[in-house]
Every structure is written in C-alpha cells, then in structure tokens.
Amino acid sequence: MNQKLEQVQKEALALCAPVFHEMEEISLFNTEKVLTAFRKHHLSAYHFAPSNGYGYGDPGREKLEEIWCDIFHAESALVRPQFVSGTHALATVLLALLQPGDTMVSAVGAPYDTMESVIGITGNAPGNLISKGVHYKEVPLKGNTYDLKAIADAVDENTKLVEIQRSRGYMLRDSLFPEDIKKIIDTVKAKNPETICFVDNCYGEFTNCLLYTSDAADDMQC
C-alpha cells in the first residue's frame, strides 16, 4: 500500500478510536447486565424447550419476562412473539390505557407514520383512538428538537397519557438521549403527576450505560 495512504489510515483509526472505545464499553456494560440477569433468574436449557402452553404454562416465556423486568427495572413485561411489529405493540398499549374522553399528547412532534391510522390522524381504520372518543394533541418541534414549554402548556388535568418517541423515525429531528426523556417526563409530572408517561424506546435498547427511561417512565415499549 502507498505510504501516504497508510498514514491516512492510521490517522483515521486514531481519530475514531475514542468512539470505538466508547461503543465497546457500552457493549460490555450491557452484556454483563444481561448475563447477570440470566444467572440471577437461573436461566437454563430447560427454558428453551418448546411448549404448547396447554394446561402447563410456558416456563420459557415466563422466565424471559422475568429477565426483561430485571434488565429494564420494570414491574411487569410482555415479551411475546404474538406482537408482530412495533406498531402492533404500541397500539396494544394505547388501546389498553386510553378510554373515551381521555386526552393523549404526542410530546415530540408527529409519531411514526404507521401510528397515524392507529390514532386516527389519517384514514378511517376501524377502532382507531379518535373514533373511540380519545382526544389527541401534538406538540410541534422547536427547530430540530423538543419544546419543554410547549409540552407543559399541552398538559392539563385531563391529559391521560403523553407519548414520547425516542427515535426520530422517518423525520429529520434529533433522536432523544435518556437525559432528554427524563426532562420531558419531569416536565409532564410537574404539570400533572397522574399523567401516564409512555416511552416508545424502539431502537434505544442497550445503546448507553444508563438505566434511563425505565426509572422514570410509567410504560415503555422496546
């Protein structure tokens, strides 16, 4: 290889080294956290055996959900192959928590495109939230990120649920860091402590060394 190219390669690797090191540290931290949960809950080959669940329960699924709770500091979890997509999981949560007359607020601009029909923003899908009498508010972004003042203004005594989407999805806004999510949750709870803070944490699992949203959010979808 040309000596000049070799030098460029060395300089590029040296420049990237701190980032690679940080990624390795995050990976090691989270791998250790998962393995610790495996040991704590005595995961074994027995739990990977197939089961029809008929009359006997499903120990593998139950063990997986125990481990998931431990890793994310949750009270309970649903980790099931019956959820065919993230939209399916999100819709399940929203349809379970929201009743006619309740108000839902999307705190970080518009949600995923696929959620628009679930909420009833577009189309006329049977059973969408708006058709069931759920009120919907959307807090516009401030430039390329969230607006805490606007979020506070959107929350009142009638706000049942605030959805916080961590990933930018198909938009060009910034994705949220755990610190950002905590600020939004604190803002919502200061305005109405009874409001449910629901975090869509899709693509955000195991990407840092913080316990983050699970310590502050009421519900979280991963």
Sequence positions of predicted segments:
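Conserved PLP-enzyme active-site core in the AAT-like
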Residues: 4-9, 16, 24, 34-35, ...
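Single conserved hydrophobic/aromatic residue that forms the stacking wall/gate
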Residues: 212-222
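Active-site rim recognition segments
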Residues: 31
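N-terminal small-domain helix-loop-helix segment of the aminotransferase-like
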Residues: 52-60
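A generic alpha-helix surface/boundary motif
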Residues: 62-63, 88
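A broadly tuned, weak detector of single residues within folded domains
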Residues: 61, 97, 217-218
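Long amphipathic N-terminal alpha/beta scaffold segment
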Residues: 63-74
